[in-house]
Amino acid sequence: PAKTPWTPMTNPLSECKVALISTAGIYMKGDESFDYERERREFIWGDPTHREIPREAGQDDVEYSHLHIDTSFLKKDRNVAWPVDIFLGYEREGKIAALTETLYSIMGYIPNFNPLVKQTAPKMIAKMKGEGVEAAFLFPV
């Protein structure tokens, strides 16, 4: 079996810049949605791309495109699958040093994960490193 890479924390979260990643297929209104139409046609395909959302985006600024979850609950409260408001509170309280300017979303249904691992993840990691991210939280749905 492959070894899972592990990087231990060197600072407490109160000193870390934190990124959030959701698998709920979240995207900004006006931006390209995740390709769930292709997924409808090809049930063994899942969109391996990602979307970047500014942290200032509000509940009404985003949309959800996911065939495998009921997104109606997200439209009422995004924090169910992507606790942005909770982490902004942590930032105000000093529990984290900062929340990144960019928040990330991918699809949770990606049967062929090679494009995600070889293309999407490196792009996301490069962006996070550029923002000085020291910890990332993944919220799978």
Predicted regions and their residues:
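Metallocofactor- and cofactor-centric catalytic cores in central/energy metabolism, strongly enriched
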Residues: P1-V141
